[in-house]
Amino acid sequence: VPAAAPPADPAALTERLKAQAYGVGFDLAGVAALGVPDSVGHFDAWLAAGHHGSMGYLDGAGAELRRDSRRPHPGATHALVVALDYGGREPAGPVARYARGDDYHEVLRDKLRTLHAWFEAQVGAPVDGRPYVDSGPLLERDLARRAGLGWFGKNTMLINPGRGSFFFLGALVLAWPLVPDAPFEADRCGRCTRCLDACPTQAF
């Protein structure tokens, strides 16, 4: 079935999509255009230094896919990028906070599939797309920064001004024109080194 023509006001559709993302339970939502990641140079340097170790899937063909977010799903042009808080302010314990609930891959993927179905209903036609939740060749933190969700902290995590970094990231890539959000350009860390100083293994 051929896809319907894009709506006259893609900005309004984009805003409705983000509002629906909040409606299904996500804590942050933004839109980014797919393309060459801003951090691709850091990624290549990381590979060249051998930091991927035995994770061979990150090199070769896997690296080529990650060097341009349009490659994993040809035809897709934009991504809805979302974040879901996992309760990182709960008391510490023997199990990492992010692992205490249901499998986050399934939780986020189900919500993204719900959004995909909602989007198709809004435009009245099938829309090619796919959800990604830490399970495909996308540099999700880079996409999230480009979608305005936060900045890269000195702890290498994406930090949001209102929510910190205790959240999962996911993306719904769509072959449909949307209006991207402004990327998060500021570096709010400044001279702060609290995360570096607190790390017990000096891993950073």
Locate the predicted segments by residue.
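Iron-sulfur cluster-binding cysteine motifs and their immediate structural context
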Residues: 23-26, 194-204
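Residues immediately within or flanking Cys/His clusters that coordinate Zn2+
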Residues: 186-192, 196
